[in-house]
């Protein structure tokens, strides 16, 4: 699985470490916008966060990018951050559907993460765990 890495500078004082064996779920999101991982990172920084809240970001062309390092608690789903991995897909799924390349990359990434973290038992849409429409479409169903 090819995962692209870009240099993202985080606000270190806001990053909290976590225990990787506690990761037991994956939560799926849409970005509600088009843009690069750097664009999302800068948006989250502008909101006073440590940086991008998601662990992975999938562009419309299917390219997968590493976001917040896994050893730090992400910021993507209240009350579930410490025990989850957040994956965000580029796009506003209120207006467009995810691309086939995004869905294929998402399937591959989820499979890779489940193999890497055997305690992962469930994959959720953000809306399954928090009062939101995100990711609008049923990404969980699309990757089954």
Residue ranges and their predicted role:
Residues 1-26, 63-64, 83, 89-144:
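Basic/polar, cationic surfaces and motifs that engage anionic cell-wall
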Residues 2-5, 9-71:
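Short, conserved "active-site rim" segments that organize catalytic pockets and cofactor/ligand binding
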Residues 36, 46, 75, 83-84, ...:
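Generic serine detector
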Residues 42-44, 56, 72-74, 80, ...:
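Generic preference for flexible, low-structure residues
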Residues 63, 70-86:
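Short, surface-exposed glycine/acidic/tryptophan-bearing loops
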